[in-house]
From Swiss-Prot:
Gene it is expressed from: slyX
InterPro entries registered for this protein in UniProt: SlyX
Domain of life: Bacteria
A Pfam family annotated for this UniProt entry: SlyX
Family: Belongs to the SlyX family.
HAMAP family: SlyX (MF_00715)
Region forming the signal peptide: none
Name of this chain's protein: Protein SlyX homolog
Length: 71
């Protein structure tokens, strides 16, 4: 009888642990998903800024022996 109660208590403790672990895993999964979405957005933003910078560099011609404006 004591063994049955001990076994029942151990099973109940394991079930509670499993429930908490499932909750923790779900919370971590949500955090990872949010982080990946942010990483994707930042990656797209960096690519767009790199394109804009490349376009700006090609559209500005280098001065060919121009005098500075103070002359």
């Amino acid at each position: 009888m004591a063994d049955d109660q001990s076994l029942s208590a151990r099973i109940e403790a394991l079930e509670m642990r499993l429930t908490y672990q499932d909750e923790t895993i779900e919370t971590l999964n949500q955090a990872v998903t949010a982080q990946w979405q942010q990483i994707d957005a930042l990656t797209r933003q960096i690519a767009a800024l790199s394109d804009r910078l490349a376009q700006a560099e090609t559209s500005v011609a280098a001065p060919a022996n121009e005098r500075p404006p103070h002359y």
